[in-house]
């Protein structure tokens, strides 16, 4: 196998992985669980310091297994009940009794959460104290990327800068672009990428959960009711939007099921997966072709998002759905050129969507971007594409660079304004 392809598989394995609950509060739970292994005792108090973006994405989302919202319960549950070896599934085994213990710590004002100034978009520092003992774990650059551990002020671990790599820079130094991703997905031996089918399994289970139970805003179930009432039809567009939104409903509503995440985001893992799975069912393709399309979608999303910070004022579901749309064209038998058209079309359609934190209404944004993916894939199959208009360049690679410029240079103040509004 080509060394370049081995790099691609390594990237996918690094950032396409199961995550139980929204990854921002889960980062605090994970840091707390790791700190607890240093302390070797239950904490008397917990202090949590986070970046503005991590704070923003933790304010309105349920923490799985707890039925509660926010960083305080995430950190307390992680410290008292978290499995430090489980990564983003750190809270998979939390019990109601342990949640009650965590809430008691919060009620006793023993859990403190505050924002801190930092250049890192993903930053979380958790300090646990028990009597005279103190343990600290610092996460930087990625939701489970530990930068430092201290016990009673003594440094016990620091990340090797040569090995530690922030998720946003994961494609640095890698020979990768949209065409190389497309060719890789087309040609790599099936057995090397068969693992990606786990994304279909996990995210489809979340979709089923969101359709069967009342989570969040019930975006998916509301569409189901509309179909049953004869108001809308159960065509490909509505089925994709309904089932993708339902998975997000369940995730944002605290369902105790993992999502296969993409670059630290469960919702974006859902957006990269469910539209592709439903399209594969529509065209009755083989399991192998579905796997190739999922690789195209997930790696395409990773590549596009590597052009800007992992947390920002820009809703990443837009470009994730662009990658999904590219894969949908592939499933329908379209050309590489038409797959590029699909990316251009989605970005033109919904690139103005902002991120104002993780919460129930994210399911609406997921449904919006998934809808754009379907429209754009249909247009692309007819060779209709946006080109040389606004931020959309004449070539897909230039468009992707433009998105990076827009987020990096144009949306920093937007992000600050959004966070300030949310904190009022």
Curated annotation (Swiss-Prot):
One GO-annotated biological process of the protein: L-cysteine catabolic process to pyruvate
A Gene Ontology molecular function term of the record: L-cysteine desulfhydrase activity
Using the record, list the residue span of the signal peptide; answer none if the entry has no such feature.
Answer: none
Family per similarity comment:
Belongs to the UPF0597 family.
The record's HAMAP family line, in alphabetical order, gives: UPF0597 (MF_01845)
The protein in question is named UPF0597 protein SO_1403
**The organism of origin for this protein:** Shewanella oneidensis (strain ATCC 700550 / JCM 31522 / CIP 106686 / LMG 19005 / NCIMB 14063 / MR-1)
């Amino acid at each position: 196998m080509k060394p370049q392809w081995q790099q691609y598989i390594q990237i996918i394995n690094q950032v396409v992985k199961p995550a139980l609950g929204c990854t921002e509060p889960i980062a605090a739970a994970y840091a707390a669980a790791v700190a607890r292994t240093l302390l070797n005792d239950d904490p008397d108090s917990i202090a949590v310091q986070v970046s503005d973006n991590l704070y923003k994405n933790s304010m309105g989302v349920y923490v799985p297994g707890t039925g509660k919202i926010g960083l305080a319960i995430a950190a307390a549950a992680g410290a008292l009940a978290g499995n430090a070896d489980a990564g983003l599934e750190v809270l998979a085994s939390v019990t109601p009794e342990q949640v009650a213990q965590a809430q008691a710590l919060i009620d006793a004002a023993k859990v403190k959460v505050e924002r801190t100034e930092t250049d890192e978009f993903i930053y979380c520092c958790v300090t646990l104290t028990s009597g005279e003992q103190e343990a600290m774990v610092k996460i930087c650059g990625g939701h489970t990327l530990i930068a430092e551990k201290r016990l009673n002020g003594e440094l016990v671990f620091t990340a090797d800068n040569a090995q530690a790599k922030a998720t946003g820079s994961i494609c640095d130094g890698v020979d990768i672009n949209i065409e190389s991703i497309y060719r890789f997905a087309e040609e790599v031996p099936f057995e090397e990428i068969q693992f990606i089918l786990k994304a279909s399994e996990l995210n489809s289970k979340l979709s089923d959960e969101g359709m069967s139970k009342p989570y969040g805003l019930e975006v998916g179930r509301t569409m189901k009711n509309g179909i049953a009432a004869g108001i809308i039809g159960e065509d490909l567009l509505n089925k994709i939007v309904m089932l993708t939104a339902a998975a997000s409903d369940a995730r944002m509503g605290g369902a105790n099921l993992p999502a296969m995440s993409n670059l630290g985001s469960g919702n974006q893992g859902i957006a990269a997966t469910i539209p592709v799975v439903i399209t594969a069912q529509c065209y009755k393709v083989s399991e192998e072709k579905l796997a190739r399309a999922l690789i195209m979608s997930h790696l395409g999303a990773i590549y596009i998002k590597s052009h800007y910070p992992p947390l920002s004022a820009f809703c990443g579901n837009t470009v994730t759905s662009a990658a999904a749309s590219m894969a949908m064209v592939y499933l329908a038998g379209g050309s590489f050129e038409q797959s590029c058209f699909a990316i251009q079309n989605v970005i033109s359609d919904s690139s103005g969507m902002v991120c104002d934190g993780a919460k129930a209404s994210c399911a609406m944004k997921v449904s919006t971007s998934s809808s754009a993916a379907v429209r754009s894939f249909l247009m692309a199959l007819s060779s209709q594409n946006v080109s040389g208009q606004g931020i959309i360049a004449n070539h897909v690679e230039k468009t992707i660079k433009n998105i990076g410029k827009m987020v990096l240079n144009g949306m920093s103040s937007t992000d600050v304004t959004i966070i300030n509004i949310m904190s009022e």
